[in-house]
């Protein structure tokens, strides 16, 4: 089981496939996603990695989080989240995950917080059909109607579909297809809509109901830092001896 990533939702657009058909996609940006902490069986009883993403001002970061990020030798992050991983996919602190973590055609599970709609009636919240528009009906056109039985059981059962607060809940959409990735700009394009407003943080992880592609990188798609080692060689100058003065 690999780690997931934290991405930021930029919005929706559409792209065209090889057949000339347009595909609606949601654009997710992966920026500065690093491992800031580890969870091990010996110390915590389970195996996981804590990721941080984005940039946060030091003055807006609490003293506790400043010490947490300083211990990991990373910059303050705007968002942190934890992902369970298998022991063989545990990542070192400071490792940066890129969009190469996912491959086109892969299925992922996406988690976000839906847009809040406020107090909504049953026709909007639960897709009720409503009552008659006329023929004796008065002021109950959009009402929910009866909510229970009679003296027995003498109550309204829990979970009854009624008017109330709608939206602003954690929603996970499973088996979304990764259409493509943009390595240079750090973008992940997934098919269809994703819960959440523009600019919100989205959790993207491998689908639990679909197999992982064989070409998916393990333990993760990390940024390779190539350090060029140059040997400093002192210049050699040839000196000619002048005979005679």
UniProtKB/Swiss-Prot annotation:
GO terms for biological process: translation. InterPro entries: Ribosomal_uL3, Ribosomal_uL3_bac/org-type, Ribosomal_uL3_CS, Transl_B-barrel_sf. GO terms for molecular function: rRNA binding; structural constituent of ribosome. The keyword RNA-binding applies. Methylated by PrmB. It comes from Bartonella tribocorum (strain CIP 105476 / IBS 506). Transmembrane segments: none annotated. It holds the Pfam family Ribosomal_L3. This is Large ribosomal subunit protein uL3.
